[in-house]
């Protein structure tokens, strides 16, 4: 279990406005409490020490919540460091693949 757990009730925090970050509401963002409480019940207890952030969208190395708070994604090293979130070239390739009649077959190359 994590040694620290963030509040699931929105608390007032200092406002932030920089090129890469914007915190303009209480944290967690109002309206995300129910999701965070459900996550506490289903996710590993070791995850409960993470910042209480429910992603709404992401671009480049930034993620956004439903209230427009803008965060730097320091977790992207696992998946997206090389290309970033919503990379236009990757999105184009994914869309082209989804338009094919066959996306994958277990036994044969596709």
Where on the chain are the PLM-derived regions?
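Glycine-rich loop-to-alpha-helix module at the N-terminal edge of alpha/beta enzyme cores
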Residues: 6, 10-24, 29, 43, ...
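Flavin-binding catalytic cores
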Residues: 32-38
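Active-site and channel-lining beta-strand-loop segments
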Residues: 52-74
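Intrinsically disordered, low-complexity segments enriched in small/polar residues
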Residues: 29-32, 47, 58
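Short, basic/aromatic recognition patches
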Residues: 40-56
């Amino acid at each position: 279990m994590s040694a620290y757990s963030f509040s699931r009730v929105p608390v007032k925090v200092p406002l932030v406005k920089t090129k890469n970050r914007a915190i303009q509401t209480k944290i967690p963002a109002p309206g995300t409490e129910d999701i965070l409480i459900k996550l506490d019940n289903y996710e590993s207890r070791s995850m409960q020490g993470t910042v209480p952030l429910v992603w709404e969208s992401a671009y480049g190395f930034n993620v956004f919540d439903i209230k427009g708070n803008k965060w730097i994604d320091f977790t992207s090293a696992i998946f997206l460091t090389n290309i970033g979130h919503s990379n236009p070239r990757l999105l184009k390739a994914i869309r082209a693949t989804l338009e094919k009649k066959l996306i994958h077959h277990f036994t044969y190359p596709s």
